[in-house]
Amino acid sequence: MLIKPGKDLKIIGGKRVLDSIKTKVNQFLGRGTSSIFVPPMDGRLKANDILDKTEVLCEIEKVDNLTVFGEHIYASSHNKLVKIIENTPEIIETFDYEITALAFGSSGVLAIGLSNDTVLCYDVGRKSIILEVEFECVTALLFWDPETLVVASGSQQFSAPDWRSDLMNLGSTGSLWVFNVESRSKKYLVGDLKWPAGLCKLNDQLLFSEAWNHSVNLIEFAAAGDFEIKSNQEILSRLPAYPSRIVNTQDNCIWLCLFAPRNQLIEFVLTEKDYRAKMLSQVDERFWIAPSFRSGLDFREPLQGGGVKMMGVLKPWAPAFSYGLVVKLDRNFQPEKSLHSRADGKAHGITSAACLPEGQLFLSSRGDNKVIRYIEQ
């Protein structure tokens, strides 16, 4: 679009001034983008303790990404690739850097994102690397077809393990890419995202979660396979927690993982620029006022009023920096049911999910170092 001098420039300049004034007013009144209001967990998101009552399949230190090939579950454990055989984790391969994303293709090739800004295509059978390509801050991977890989890049400023730093710096430099394995070409899809953390193919449409925006978006393409975006709409917003990986079921429903809760104290800190700058520079990251995979393990952690233990007991409804939550969405992308591990629970930091037949749902509890199995009735 051509911009004519004079009137058009005045309109653009005036809009910028009005936007700046609106931002200042919102900051003063605590509304709009400066609001610290957190939606309650109610209705289909009402708290329960189902995750704490489910079967513990196995314990894996720093378990994160789950993916399925055939009848087996594969997982990441820091820099190790693990295969779960008869409820026992077996190390398949060890890498020099932390694994940040996993995705199997129909041909049996495993895409692996590493924290050194690299994506590998790995032959699990031969235990060999087929190809290696550079991508910044890989947070999620998805094989669209045997030759096409969708890549989520969380940030241009921080690596995937530094997700808390990106949140505290109000990061919005994430992006989605399409990579052709045969030609090794990259195609940019969409940018300026606030930490895209999950990808899912649904009827030739792309579903992705945006953690710091507390939302899930649906991209529709103009034609199958061309990756020209026809529409990009927000289908789920104002979530009470930070969304992560997404997996679809055989009946085209969705399981959405949410790895940590939002709360008003964190939302308030995110509006205080000077305070955040001092906290990031002077305080150990473990003790930031920020979400966590697991909290309550150190007396030096920040304490919220409702989180004080009474008679040595932490109330399940206490405000916490960690939580366990996974939500099932129906075909209209509305919450159908939710599984929780509350403040006093033992299945926090649900980062990833994988589905097997007969309603089996496997979940990685990064905060409590275990894989749990939920069987839907």
Which residue ranges define each predicted feature?
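A short helix->beta-strand "capping" segment at the edge of beta-propeller domains
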Residues: 11, 20, 30-62, 329-342
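A short beta-strand motif characteristic of beta-propeller blades
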Residues: 52-58, 88-94, 126-132, 185-190, ...
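Beta-rich, blade/repeat-based domains predominating
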Residues: 59-69, 96-107, 134-148, 155-157, ...
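Conserved beta-strand positions in repeat-built beta-propeller and related beta-rich domains
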Residues: 74-79, 111-117, 150-167, 207-213, ...
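Short loop/turn segments that connect beta-strands within beta-propeller blades
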Residues: 84-88, 123-126, 180-184, 220-225, ...
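Asp-box/WD-like beta-propeller blade repeats and closely related beta-sheet repeat scaffolds
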Residues: 117, 126-144, 152-165, 171-173
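Short, conserved, GDST-rich strand-edge loop motifs in beta-rich repeat architectures
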Residues: 152-171, 259-321
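Blade-level signature of beta-propeller repeat domains, shared across WD40, Kelch, NHL, RCC1
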Residues: 350-377
